[in-house]
A protein has these predicted regions:
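Hydrophobic/aromatic-lined pockets within catalytic cores
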Residues: 11, 15, 76, 117-118, ...
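C-terminal segment of N-terminal export signals and the immediately downstream linker at the start
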Residues: 1, 20-54
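Helix-terminus loop motifs that line ligand-binding clefts
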Residues: 122-150
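Long, well-ordered hydrophobic secondary-structure segments characteristic of membrane-embedded
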Residues: 95, 100-113, 130
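Amphipathic alpha-helical dimerization/protein-protein interaction segment
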Residues: 42-84, 133-137
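N-terminal export signals
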Residues: 5-27
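Well-ordered alpha-helical scaffold segments within catalytic/enzyme domains
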Residues: 47-59, 108-121
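Internal amphipathic alpha-helical repeat/solenoid segments
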Residues: 73-102, 123, 147-148
Length: 150
């Protein structure tokens, strides 16, 4: 092999190795939950916790199972501000990197939980609170698409 071919092949090999994440080369990975502790979660749902347990038994790939466990409940764990205002549920969902709620995105973020609302009264109230909040926002400014909580 001549020097030019050697350098070309070596460069390609090094380039290929740099595109492979180091963790993918490690065989014995531990998939530890990255969810916040229960006391730090912004909202909890027994139906969501049950579906996570159920789905994890069906997913054979340990990493995909871990991803599902961490990603599916993320909206509830980290972005929900639920309270009662004048005796009615009110749900504000942070939908981006600032503490604001986009109407379209807040709807999209609760969409995966809709099949579970018949099983969990807390989820029903969360969705009702979101509808109440979105109604207030639209009445405040029908042309805006994002709102702060205040």
């Amino acid at each position: 092999m001549n020097r030019k071919t050697f350098l070309k092949n070596s460069s390609l090999a090094v380039g290929a190795l740099t595109t492979i994440p180091l963790q993918s080369l490690i065989k014995n990975k531990e998939f530890i939950s990255k969810r916040p502790p229960v006391y730090e979660r912004t909202f909890t749902s027994s139906a969501v916790e049950e579906i996570i347990k159920k789905i994890k038994t069906v997913i054979k790939d340990e990493e995909v199972s871990w991803l599902f466990e961490n990603c599916y409940p993320n909206t509830l764990d980290t972005t929900v501000d639920f309270e009662y205002i004048d005796g009615k549920p009110d749900t504000f969902i942070i939908t981006g990197d600032i503490d604001a709620m986009w109407l379209r995105d807040s709807t999209a973020q609760v969409w995966p939980y809709l099949p579970l609302i018949n099983e969990d009264e807390k989820l029903q109230k969360l969705v009702k609170g979101l509808i109440n909040r979105q109604t207030k926002c639209i009445l405040l400014d029908p042309y805006a698409n994002a709102f702060y909580k205040d």
